[in-house]
């Protein structure tokens, strides 16, 4: 556990920079394939460390990484793929994992918006976040479950687990749980760096780490939320399906979302894409909905490269690379928004949203 989903992404990436990984470690200047149409903290750790994000376009109406672009994005500097399952819709994990396995790359699944989503791979259903090398979750209040604030990482690799915990806990080499001592039975008998022989293992630091722990109180809230998670996921799915069914009559004006093939999404939101010939703009329908008390959200950054944080990098044309064009990414920036499928929404609330969207579309 950690204190946020963004911290989980930071720890996931930084774990792959550990010298303990030898030749597979990510070094400054190495490349990480990702997308610009997402939340910034999937990309932020890459840039902060000094690695190079390589942006590829996404698909519409899936809003996930376009796997046909992966080979074009690959170079002799590529070390990892780090992408999110957008609003609960899994990306094509089979294709991405096959690509990573072929080239010996790490795969980080940002699962912060997709807790409970599943994907059929290798003859069985698997939860997203458990298929790559590291998965991350967020327990921020709007997400599927919450701890007030909080996040988690999951991996089947014991070495990565210990590296992640080291970065989370100040960079210490010791892997004892809080309140425990001498788990390794060699606390005062080992040699590290140029320290004196037998220096206390609890105070040996193998990484330049952080303090990103979560409190016991938050963890207790998370345990209680886990009991409710199946019902939460089911309600989100039902709300999404209801919106999809009722809004389908506006398909001539709106592009509605589609789940990825071989997936069982645990939906975080409902994406609406305004067609070019709809007779109105994204901003106009968003303004109408907001004035009627219906909250809307952009699809996160839209195109992250267009934001002020990229001004200097964009001007100097350094620090990142774009593979091909980002046509769909730019379309998302201009034409896409999403509305909620919160499990506490009643049928009356959903009908109100549908009614207001219909009113607007009929008036144009």
Residue ranges, per PLM feature:
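Phosphate-binding glycine-rich loop
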Residues: 1-31, 44-49, 55-56
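PLP-dependent aminotransferase class I/II
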Residues: 5-6, 68, 80-84, 93-95, ...
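Hydrophobic residues in well-ordered beta-strands that form the structural core
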Residues: 34, 55, 107-109, 137, ...
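Conserved coil-to-alpha-helix start sites within the AMP-binding
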Residues: 38-43
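Hydrophobic/aromatic ligand-binding patch that stacks against planar heteroaromatic rings
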Residues: 45-46, 99, 127, 217
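Helix C-cap/helix->beta junction micro-motif
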Residues: 49, 102-103, 292
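Short beta-strand->loop structural element characteristic of the AMP-binding/adenylate-forming
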Residues: 52-62, 297
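Active-site phosphate-binding strand-loop segment of PLP-dependent enzymes
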Residues: 61-162, 338
């Amino acid at each position: 556990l950690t204190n946020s989903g963004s911290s989980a992404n930071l720890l996931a990436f930084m774990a792959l920079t550990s010298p303990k990984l030898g030749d597979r470690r990510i070094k400054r200047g190495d490349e990480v394939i990702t997308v610009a149409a997402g939340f910034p903290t999937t990309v932020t750790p890459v840039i902060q460390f000094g690695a190079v994000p390589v942006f590829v376009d996404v698909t519409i109406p899936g809003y996930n990484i376009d796997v046909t672009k992966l080979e074009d994005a690959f170079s002799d500097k590529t070390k990892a793929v780090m992408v999110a399952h957008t609003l609960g819709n899994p990306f094509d994990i089979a294709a991405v994992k096959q690509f990573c396995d072929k080239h010996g790359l790490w795969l980080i699944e940002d699962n912060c918006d997709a807790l409970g989503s599943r994907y059929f791979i290798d003859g069985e259903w698997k939860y997203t976040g458990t298929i790559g090398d590291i998965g991350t979750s967020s327990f921020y209040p709007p997400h599927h479950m919450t701890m007030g604030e909080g996040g988690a990482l999951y991996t089947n690799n014991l070495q990565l687990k210990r590296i992640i915990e080291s970065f989370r806990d100040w960079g210490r080499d010791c892997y004892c749980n809080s309140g425990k001592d001498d788990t390794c039975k060699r606390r005062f008998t080992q040699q590290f760096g140029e320290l004196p022989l037998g220096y206390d293992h609890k105070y040996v630091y193998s990484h330049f780490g952080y303090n990103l722990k979560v409190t016991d109180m938050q963890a207790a809230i998370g345990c209680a939320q886990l009991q409710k998670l199946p019902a939460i996921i089911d309600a989100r799915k039902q709300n999404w399906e209801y919106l999809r069914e009722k809004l389908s009559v506006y398909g001539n004006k709106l592009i509605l979302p589609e789940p990825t093939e071989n997936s069982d999404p645990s939906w975080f939101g409902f994406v609406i894409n305004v067609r070019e010939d709809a007779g109105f703009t994204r901003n106009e329908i968003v303004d109408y909905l907001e004035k009627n008390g219906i909250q809307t959200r952009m699809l996160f950054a839209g195109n992250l490269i267009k934001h002020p944080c990229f001004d200097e990098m964009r001007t100097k044309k350094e620090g990142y690379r774009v593979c091909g064009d980002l046509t769909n990414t730019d379309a998302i920036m201009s034409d896409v928004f999403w509305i909620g499928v919160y499990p506490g929404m009643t049928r009356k609330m959903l009908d109100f949203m549908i009614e207001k969207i219909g009113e607007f579309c009929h008036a144009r």
